[in-house]
C-alpha cells in the first residue's frame, strides 16, 4: 500500500467524524449493512480469528426487545436511530478456524481445550473489529453512536441465546443531526501519549 488517503477521506474517518446522539429521519438502505460487513471484515485479527458478530436491529419488534435493556439515558437516542447494531464477540470463534485459517491445521481442536485463551482472544480481537466496524461505517457515509450503557447479560439472553456470543457495544447507525452535537472534546497530544525510543 503506497498511497496515503487524501485529506477529505481522513476528515471523514477521523478528524471531522463525531459520535452522534441525534439522528435525521433518513433511512439506511439494507444493502449498505451488507457493504459495511464486507468492508469491516478485512481488518486484521490474531490468527484471523474474526470473533465479531453483529445483530442489526431495524424492525419494530426487535427494537421493542432491545430498548428496555438500554440504560435510561441511552433509550431515546437509540429509539431514534435508523439502525442499531449490537456488536458481540464469539468466544467459540475457534469453530470457524478451518475456514478462517486453513494454514493452521488443528487450530479448532487446540482451542477447544483452552476456554481462558479463547475468552481473552475474543475480547481483544472483538474490540479491534468493533473499531474497524465504526471506521467502515464512516467510510460508507454513515454516522455512528457507540455506547456501553446497556444490560449486557440481558442483551445476551435476548439476542444471542444458545450461542457463546457476548455483547460488547451497542452502536447506533444512520445520518447524524449536527444540531445534537456538543463542542468537540480535546485529545491528548503526541508528547503526552507517545514516545519514540
Curated annotation (Swiss-Prot):
One of the Pfam families matching this protein, by short name: Nitroreductase
Cofactor: FMN
Lineage top rank: taxon: Bacteria
SUPFAM superfamilies in the cross-refs: FMN-dependent nitroreductase-like (SSF55469)
Keyword annotations: Flavoprotein, FMN, NAD, NADP, Oxidoreductase
EC id: 1.-.-.-
Top class in the EC scheme: oxidoreductase
GO molecular function: oxidoreductase activity
InterPro entries reported for this sequence: Nitroreductase, Nitroreductase-like, Nitroreductase_HadB/RutE, RutE-like
PANTHER family: MALONIC SEMIALDEHYDE REDUCTASE RUTE-RELATED
Family recorded in the similarity comment: Belongs to the nitroreductase family. HadB/RutE subfamily.
NCBIfam families from the UniProt entry: PRK05365.1
HAMAP family: Oxidoreductase_RutE_HadB (MF_01204)
Name used for this protein in its record: Putative NADH dehydrogenase/NAD(P)H nitroreductase Lcho_1290
Organism: Leptothrix cholodnii (strain ATCC 51168 / LMG 8142 / SP-6) (Leptothrix discophora (strain SP-6))
